[in-house]
Design a protein with these regions (language model features):
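...captures the hydrophobic TM-helix bundle architecture rather than a specific catalytic motif
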Residues: 1-185
Length: 185
């Protein structure tokens, strides 16, 4: 984040950054924000195992479900930490091998940042059968559906980029088309 903020080329505004750079910014924000929850869970489980604490040990009054919440609160955004740079690479490859500029650049950036904004509120869809209160099912179901909107912005940009392009079918382009196809089905 600091590198992009302070060491951009002279005259390069935020609106002219390559989409791959935006995808790395998005992944970096997620890593910076959510990794500390994983570290806290690891510290708590270490204290349970070594020092006799009982954060997660039900026999001693701990809450095993708390570990599951903390685990998924980190692990679901971690999926996006891994996939967002891949989205950026895919969009760059599609633009290059379609011989066109990226379609709807600002919408693609908004999609990447929208995924970042929503990724912290979808973790509990992994926990519908683990004892979570029933009244929480609907909000997490809705958040799971809503996160598809910014993802749709990213893939609309991908499809718009290849539309009417002079497509050059080489190995990177075939791989990028495979990524788009897999995320669209």
């Amino acid at each position: 984040l600091v590198t992009v903020t302070h060491l951009r080329a002279p005259g390069m505004s935020w609106g002219r950054l390559p989409i791959f750079v935006w995808s790395v910014i998005a992944a970096s924000i997620l890593a910076f924000t959510f990794t500390q929850f994983f570290a806290a869970a690891m510290l708590m489980i270490t204290l349970d195992r070594i020092a006799g604490f009982s954060f997660f040990n039900a026999d001693k009054g701990g809450a095993p479900l708390l570990y599951q919440h903390i685990f998924w609160f980190y692990s679901h955004p971690a999926v996006y930490i891994f996939v967002l740079p891949g989205f950026g690479i895919t969009l760059e490859v599609l633009a290059h091998f379609s011989r066109k500029p990226l379609f709807a650049y600002r919408w693609a950036v908004a999609g990447l940042l929208g995924i970042v904004a929503l990724s912290g509120v979808v973790w509990a869809h992994h926990m519908f059968v683990s004892g979570m209160p029933t009244w929480l099912h609907a909000p997490f179901l809705v958040s799971t559906e809503v996160i598809s909107v910014p993802t749709g912005f990213v893939f609309l940009s991908a499809l718009g980029t290849i539309w009417m392009g002079r497509i050059w079918l080489r190995t990177p382009m075939l791989f990028a088309l495979g990524v788009v196809f897999n995320f669209m089905i």
